[in-house]
């Protein structure tokens, strides 16, 4: 796949890659992380090294609610499913929703890893035009009309509203509201992929789209960019009606996300100045 090829090249020591979305961990204090892991093993190793819940550790899910609150989301921990990175969350959503030949609407251009996932489930990907402010609402209306006129079924709209991959565009608040209104009217779920929302340089990004619509938006989050990508922990915040389906799909795939990495992150969030650490990443990337 394209994403596998990117990471294969990026892993070569002589290459400085700008292609793979790999975070720069030079701002992450390794001694601090070593202390977190050491303390976890000494005080709670039996739980950390055991199987866990297919939905994710309850304490971490509560802490994820606090993280999402920074972007205006009021969430119930029971509606969160912890995954092995948000890429797995996207795979689970695709597995639940997509039948061969179904249409998924995406931005033009869009994240290559998402496109590969949709095509793996034999979806037909329809690109919707963007401009310098992101996805164009009128183009979304036109795409929906065209797809349905051809008798095809749209399963969801996938977009990255904050610092979009690969363009870096941040979707303005008024467009978010308009896009949500269109999708509600047309009864189309929105899959909001938001790994970069807390990494704004000069000003906070607008509130997450999920903050405005809890019934029609499936929100994907990740600690890959705000802590470390190697921990491989993300999550999906879903409408209550979808939660059990997502948990069952995840359990059938991986049984449960790693308790060790979940509790490492939970300890980090509980005991370390994680907001200051995110600010350090922002300053590093700004330079």
Enumerate the predicted regions with their spans.
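Short, intrinsically disordered, charge-balanced linker/junction segments flanking boundaries
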Residues: 1, 280-287
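Glycine/Thr-rich phosphate-binding loops of Rossmann-like dinucleotide-binding domains
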Residues: 26-28, 90, 114, 167-168, ...
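Conserved core segment of the aminotransferase class I/II
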Residues: 211-213, 218-283
């Amino acid at each position: 796949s394209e994403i596998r090829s990117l990471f294969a090249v990026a892993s070569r020591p002589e290459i400085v890659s700008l292609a793979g979305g790999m975070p720069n961990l030079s701002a992450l204090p390794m001694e601090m992380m070593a202390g977190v892991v050491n303390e976890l093993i000494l005080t709670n190793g039996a739980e950390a090294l055991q199987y866990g819940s297919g939905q994710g550790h309850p304490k971490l899910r509560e802490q994820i609610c606090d993280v999402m609150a920074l972007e205006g989301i009021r969430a119930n921990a029971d509606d969160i499913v912890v995954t092995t990175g948000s890429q797995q969350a996207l795979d689970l959503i695709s597995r639940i929703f997509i039948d061969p030949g179904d249409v998924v609407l995406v931005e033009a251009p869009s994240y290559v890893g998402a496109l590969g996932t949709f095509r793996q489930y034999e979806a037909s990907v329809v690109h919707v035009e963007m401009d310098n402010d992101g996805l164009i609402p009128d183009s979304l209306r036109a795409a929906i009309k065209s797809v349905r006129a051809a008798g095809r079924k749209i399963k969801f709209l996938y977009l990255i509203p904050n610092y979009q991959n690969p363009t870096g565009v941040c979707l303005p608040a008024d467009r978010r509201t308009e896009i949500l209104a269109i999708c509600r009217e047309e009864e189309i779920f929105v899959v909001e992929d938001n790994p970069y929302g807390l990494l704004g340089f000069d000003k906070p990004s607008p509130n997450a789209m999920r903050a405005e619509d809890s019934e029609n938006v499936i929100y994907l989050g990740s600690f890959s960019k705000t802590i470390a990508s190697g921990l491989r922990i993300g999550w999906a915040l879903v409408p209550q009606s979808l939660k059990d389906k997502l948990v069952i799909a995840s359990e059938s795939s991986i049984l449960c996300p790693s308790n060790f990495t979940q509790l490492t992150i939970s300890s980090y969030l509980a005991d370390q100045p994680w907001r200051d650490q995110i600010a350090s990443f922002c300053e590093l990337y700004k330079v």
